[in-house]
UniProtKB/Swiss-Prot annotation:
Record's protein name: Vacuolar membrane protease
Gene Ontology CC entries for this record: vacuolar membrane
Disulfide partners: none
Topological region Vacuolar: 32-369, 445-450, 512-521, 664-685, 735-957
Glycosylated residue positions: N48, N105, N136, N782, N818, N834
Gene source species: Pyrenophora tritici-repentis (strain Pt-1C-BFP) (Wheat tan spot fungus)
Cofactor: Zn(2+)
Amino acid sequence: MARYNPFSFTPGPVVFFTTVIYVGLFAALLVTHLTVPDYPSDPPAGINLTEAWADLEHITRRFHPYNSHANDHVRGYLLSRIQGVIATKALDASQVEVIDDLTSNATFSSGATSVYFEGTNIIVVIRGSEDDEPFNSTDRKPNNGGVLVNAHYDSVSSGYGATDDGVGVVTVLQLLSYFTESHNWPKRTIILLLNNGEEDFLNGAKAFMRNPISQVPHTFVNLEGAGAGGRATLFRSTDTEVTRFYSKSKYPFGTVVSGDGFKKGLIRSETDYRVFHGELGLRGLDIAFMEPRARYHTVEDSTRETSMNSLWHMLSAALASTSGLAAVTGEEFSGSESLDNGRVNAGRGSDGVWFDLFGRVFVVFQLHTLFALCVTLLVVAPIALIGLTFGLSKADKNYLLARKAFVYSSDDDNPVQLYGWRGFFRFPIVFVSATAVVVALAYLLVRFNAFIIYSSPFAVWSMMLSAWFFVAWFFSRGADAMRPSALQRMYALIWLFIGSFVLLTIITVFVNNYQVVAGYPALFYFAVVFAALMLSYLELFFAPTKSAYARHFEHDTSSRRNSESASRPLTGSTTAARSDDRPVADDDATETTSLLRGDRRGFTRYGSRRDSTSEGDEDHAQGSRRLDLGNVYPGEQEWSGKLPSWIWIIQLLLLAPLVIVLVGQVALLLTSALYQTPSDGNSPLFIYLAIAALSVLLLAPTGPFIHRFTYHVPTFLFLVCLATVIYNLVAFPFSRDHRLKVYFVQRVNCETGANTVSLTGLDSYVQRIVGELPSAQDQPLNCTTPDVATRKELKTCEWEGLPAKVVPNAAGAAPFGNETNTDRWLEYSIHKGNRSNKATIRVVGLNTRACRIVFDSPITGLAVTGAVSDPRFKPVGAAGSREVRLWHREFGQPWNVALTWDAEEHAKLSGRVVCLWSDANTGSIPAFDEVQHYLPVWAIPSKISDGLVEGFKQFEI
């Protein structure tokens, strides 16, 4: 009885090993992505997680945007905590300096917007043990750089800010405690920055640039949050050298794909990273939480939605990165001389490629290494395959696309059919068919239920993966049943090689020309396909020579010509026959078939050990000496019987694991980053097409083996596909756990008292939401395209809402009454200069520290009383400014704004003076409270701009 080979290329082993590998690795990736490592019961000395959690609960009790009284309370609490840490450890001013920065201000522009901002940052400087130079001296050596760790303590007006950025703030407090332990004291100076005003225009980081201490750090670690809980990912990094310090983290998490997402605008949020690197010149890291985005900037960004594990994940990453950077004593992050443009000379790093493996291992290498490897593979791989093809031809064993073999010469009238071409075009047909189905499903979802991805991303993934696999199996298995081919696996690998070669070529161009490295998995994809294909080439060297195989039938043919009972030709089941003996193609052998045809054996012995005939004996076999063809898989070419039946398992292990891990990681990251962005106005079609493409890349490695699958797994996946298609088409796209974000603002005409409340959101859904609000019922809705550039794909619905009570009638009154006439909410006066194109506007708003001046035509010059000039900042952009945003440290203080405009083009300057109110803690914005109270459970409000309430008056000069 033949022994069973558990690794043979037969249905049982193929189904088992392929299923185990895919299911096991998918499960491991999901566990890594969706769970957070436990925090330690015994953290490092100086770290107190219980204390950190208590701090987080305290600062997130109320909304605390810059323009709120709660913001001042948070600031006072942080100062007291910092002083408490310093006092506990008996540190003096020479070791730790606290800078309560109430003097820095910045005037700058971005596009058509100008900003004047007064900072209230808190800065703690821990002098490094090897830093004995004064911080504010021009004689400070340019290579004596420190490390900046930043978090912002303001929240948005519609969220408590636990993740954005409360966890970052308490992390900074714990770093202060850690690095002021004597045995943890850093060699480099560490600057801990708690900035205020990040949410409104990255204002706090700009104000930090105005402080002289900003010239001390050369590297930075920015702590942020764009979700609620989960793992803190490495959002982006400036260079390879800095990233290597993040790799010291115990639980690294992230991929360079997110960095490219910022570059290409796929991720619309911005962080202080842009200021520190782009304007100050520092090199560093952006570590942030990233999902779920539906809770970002809402009341669900609270301690209830995060955890101690998430806090520890960010803290441990910041601790490892900061410790490493603060221990560098060389000049790796320093230029040779100081710069005179206000930027820090932190040297130049190399663009990098980085990704984690299961949240435990972090891989980092340089971009030019990626480029070199890509070019090398693109050159070496085709040459190697050409060489192997030549070797097979020299050995007379090249069955690829071989149609026939001759016993004596090419003049032989009776060649033996090899059928080496069979199955060559099979894989591209299968691939295109399956891919077309998943692309069609993407368009189907957009047509009938475009936003189901918002709440059910894994249902969409299940649909795409199961659809592609079933369709690919159906066509591949059907073709194999009709025309079996021993070369189907190799031909599939050849087509995969061609496709991945083209993909890698494109990626290489992007790497070289645009420094976009998000396609790094293509390098590994191509490498494993190349390795697997080489094994198939080497496998053919085990086949008999074509000449020996042809002579194998010489005696058989002679015998059959002399026997009337053996007149039936060799058939398609053996797939080797004389060309003139094939009146019927692809018939099965019967009892009339010659018994001397190649020692035909049953499939039960496929893959078992057999005695083989030597090559020399094959070439000289005569008469009754027959060629031992081994065990042929039913229906496949007889010359394939001697091919090793176990090579496929090595090919599967080469192809599947690395592709699943690298592509799967990118797939999960992109899903997390994008699946809830349609509420921001992003196109859902792009998301579905991205999932379809990634599904194809994930499952394409099954192509060479899928024809061996029995119907069981594909049938199950067909049922999964059917169920998920139905669900994805009919299910409501939002839920209590995945709420649709809508954006709130209330605008009050302070001259007439008229107020308009608006919600901006997805078309058709925002109308349903507004219809459930008591104040909007029985009112005509005006739904238009929003005037916010980043929300153009949404709809804004307006109605007359509940009056705002943002200005108290008497000092200290809360909740505020509405007895104060709206005309007194803001005041302005205009003083015209001696020239027709100059004027000064004095603006003051009650109970606010944020106002704007919006112009109908651009201004060309701007100067705010008290502003400090900085050559790094341009008050007005090249095309002028249409809006000036004004921020004070104190409530109710005036701004004096001197303006210049082009009088030749615009004889008059007109526009609006607007003041903002953002404090939703005291019941002073009843319209916002109403929205929060009456919104359906599947929706949640967020702010659309800096203020929840905007009061305005018109002006003309």
